[in-house]
Amino acid sequence: MRIYEGSPREDFEEVFRSIGAFLDQRGMKEILLAEAPDGFIVQGLVTSVSNSTSDLMGTVVKETLTFLDDDIARFMEEAIARRGQGEPPPDAGEAGYYETAFRVLGRYMDEQRPRDVFFFEQEGSFVLRLLPMGTSGNRHILAEFTREDIADMIARAPTLRYPPAKTGAKTTAGR
């Protein structure tokens, strides 16, 4: 994992959160993500809407996207700017799901410290294949998360962001 300019630290959490937000905006489903030397390759299903009367429901097509390092840095900047505005994400079925799911998976990966990642999602469940750093890094490890696991991780995520503030604590700043 590379360090992205402006990122407070080298982390999968923020990178995947940004990619997930982009995928939510596109309405992409059933995601496959693989790390490449210069970024990430993502495949998923997208429903394309047609004006044809015989195609009222739209057509599901498989799309492949390549996110280069510069794209990821831009997505991260856009996500940070968007967060403070309080605007709801565009309606795309489960809009916002991939942003939050990818974020908690990224946090899990940050704890594992892999040097290479691959994962896929189907119906909200994820299978990860990680190549660990260090001397034991000569074999991939697998991790599986059900939709319920992801929901639980998302629910717990706010408690992991910042240490709880102490009420009534006095500051000694400036002394």
What are these regions (language model features)?
Residues 1-30, 69-113, 152-166:
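Negatively charged, low-complexity tracts enriched in Asp/Glu with abundant Ser/Thr
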Residues 8, 29, 41, 46, ...:
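Compositionally biased, intrinsically disordered low-complexity regions
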Residues 17-51, 104-134:
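Amphipathic, interaction-prone secondary-structure segments
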Residues 45-86, 126-164:
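Intrinsically disordered, low-complexity regulatory segments enriched in Ser/Thr/Pro
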Residues 168-175:
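Short acidic DE-rich linear segments
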